[in-house]
Amino acid sequence: MKFPGPLENQRLSFLLEKAITREAQMWKVNVRKMPSNQNVSPSQRDEVIQWLAKLKYQFNLYPETFALASSLLDRFLATVKAHPKYLSCIAISCFFLAAKTVEEDERIPVLKVLARDSFCGCSSSEILRMERIILDKLNWDLHTATPLDFLHIFHAIAVSTRPQLLFSLPKLSPSQHLAVLTKQLLHCMACNQLLQFRGSMLALAMVSLEMEKLIPDWLSLTIELLQKAQMDSSQLIHCRELVAHHLSTLQSSLPLNSVYVYRPLKHTLVTCDKGVFRLHPSSVPGPDFSKDNSKPEVPVRGTAAFYHHLPAASGCKQTSTKRKVEEMEVDDFYDGIKRLYNEDNVSENVGSVCGTDLSRQEGHASPCPPLQPVSVM
């Protein structure tokens, strides 16, 4: 891989300075409002941001589109006092504005299709009217620096100044690693507790947390980025704590991989007059045999089974009082079925011991030939 040279580093520094200047002009301190019927609550804001994230995947749009849509929505909600019943219309209008700003012409969704498939409850004309209101309130200025823009810049600076970072990612390329961080950032943008920080602070906190896992000199890299961005270190520490807590709760909320342990059920074999064994299943339902083949169908969830000593069938005559009811494992019974249908050609005796002493102890002949001494020619 060709690492960026001094000119590329200067270009990254210029982009960072330009983005910070742009953010300082647009960003407003988020003032938490009391939940009421006249104001959009923080939970309602998070729900509509998560809805926009689903629309981003539904219409296969860029992450930059979602980042710009959420930034436009937050800027608009910080400027005006919006009623909650108009929140979906405001959000879909910001989403459509972001798509027209970021996406190529052929990737921009048709307005009628967007209004229909998003189930926003708004018509195309209502979305267009809300678009005009949003543009007027934002002074027709949609080119704002999003947290995703800062994430791209910080990640590029980290890769260019710390080449050893690439060796810490043996299975991921820099672009794939950036995609993983992008997904985490999109989740953090749906958290209203992180609105108190600027987008640059949020992106730097995520990069700092990730560098802490990968390289030993992550602290020096964080200080360098902090000085270039001209941020407060105390705010960065507080933002790191909130981001780490949010990502930890996000990972703990994911469904775990279920592991099922199969425990075979016990069956009782009753001997009849003619030497025929009749199988009496236990009261707990066990595995069946499919109609297509003779192999058992393993149940999805195994259940603990116990030995059930069932009485002999009425048609069977008990010839001896000393005769005991023989019990067989289900696996042994399956082996007998396989032999009956000539399915024992599979090598299942790999782990068997071929010694004669062991076969004598077990009371049966070993399928392997006896060991012979090696004769020296």
UniProtKB/Swiss-Prot annotation:
CDD domains xref list: CYCLIN_CCNI-like (cd20526)
tRNA processing recorded as keyword: no
Main location: nucleus
Tissues where the protein occurs: Highest levels in adult heart, brain and skeletal muscle. Lower levels in adult placenta, lung, kidney and pancreas. Also high levels in fetal brain and lower levels in fetal lung, liver and kidney. Also abundant in testis and thyroid.
The organism's place on the tree of life at top rank: Eukaryota
Record-level GO BP terms: G1/S transition of mitotic cell cycle; spermatogenesis
Subcellular location: Nucleus membrane
Name of the featured protein: Cyclin-I
Species whose genome carries this gene: Homo sapiens (Human)
